[in-house]
């Protein structure tokens, strides 16, 4: 495996119900990312913004496009927070934003991002696709394809895809492998339909796992632990 993209939800950066950012959690994520980076694998990241603002369910009476732009700005804050933690470990990283903010971070340039990774730097993609009405999951799959990644991994609070919500149904069963068509036809909410369609059309495998420990990213890269894979028709 040469190059991978890890999607991290904004909620994962926060202590549950306590704060917008949890320094211990962010440090744990950074150490886990460094561990994979030290394997010689090129790593890029997409960060969500749901711990700060979620466009689809934010302030009432704000139109969807404006809310989505607010969510994109939230992802930039999260990207800078994670960049600081990664750099503090002695690993060089760069933030690239789909919405240019030149005094804060680099604008997104595909070839420059690839060049950074080839120079052993971690690249953090912020501001989603730069367009409203597209989720950060869609941005993650899009960047995975653009970067020529071998796989897109989505780190969540649940260790894979289940037949039902495992938090409310103790009999829910984890599904280890699904096709893109399965996810679309069953309307599974693990990824939005745009993200699944892009992955399917470009043959990008997607792995869903729980990013609950420093070792989680490392383990799933080495095909250890619990996870679900989406690939194949």
UniProtKB/Swiss-Prot annotation:
List the InterPro entries: AceGlu_kinase-like_sf, Asp/Glu/Uridylate_kinase, Uridylate_kinase, Uridylate_kinase_bac
UniProt keyword list:
ATP-binding, Cytoplasm, Kinase, Nucleotide-binding, Pyrimidine biosynthesis, Transferase
- Name one cellular component (GO) term: cytosol
**UniProt GO molecular function:** ATP binding; UMP kinase activity
* Localization in the cell: Cytoplasm
Listed binding positions for UMP are 49, 68, 129-136
Q: Which Pfam families match?
A: AA_kinase (PF00696)
Q: In which pathway does it act?
A: Pyrimidine metabolism; CTP biosynthesis via de novo pathway; UDP from UMP (UMPK route): step 1/1
Physiological role: Catalyzes the reversible phosphorylation of UMP to UDP.
Task: Kindly state the subunit structure of this protein.
Answer: Homohexamer.
Protein name per its UniProtKB record:
Uridylate kinase
């Amino acid at each position: 495996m040469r190059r991978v993209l890890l999607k991290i939800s904004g909620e994962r950066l926060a202590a549950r119900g306590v704060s917008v950012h949890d320094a211990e959690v962010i440090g744990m994520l950074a150490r886990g990312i460094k561990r994979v980076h030290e394997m010689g694998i090129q790593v890029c990241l997409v960060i969500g913004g749901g711990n700060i603002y979620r466009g689809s369910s934010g302030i009432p009476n704000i139109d969807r496009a404006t809310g989505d732009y607010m969510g994109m700005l939230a992802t930039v804050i999260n990207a800078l927070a994670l960049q600081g933690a990664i750099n503090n470990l002695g690993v060089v990283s760069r933030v690239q934003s789909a919405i240019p903010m030149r005094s804060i971070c680099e604008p997104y340039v595909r070839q420059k991002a690839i060049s950074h990774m080839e120079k052993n730097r971690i690249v953090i993609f912020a501001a989603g696709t730069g367009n409203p009405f597209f989720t950060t999951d869609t941005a993650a799959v899009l960047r995975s394809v653009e970067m020529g990644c071998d796989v897109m991994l989505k780190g969540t609070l649940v260790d894979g895809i289940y037949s039902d919500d495992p938090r409310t149904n103790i009999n829910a069963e984890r599904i280890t492998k699904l096709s893109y068509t399965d996810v679309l036809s069953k309307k599974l909410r693990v990824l939005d339909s745009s993200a699944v369609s892009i992955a399917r059309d470009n043959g990008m495998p997607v792995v869903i796992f729980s990013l609950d420990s420093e070792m989680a990213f490392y383990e799933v890269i080495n095909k250890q632990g619990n996870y679900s894979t989406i690939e194949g028709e």
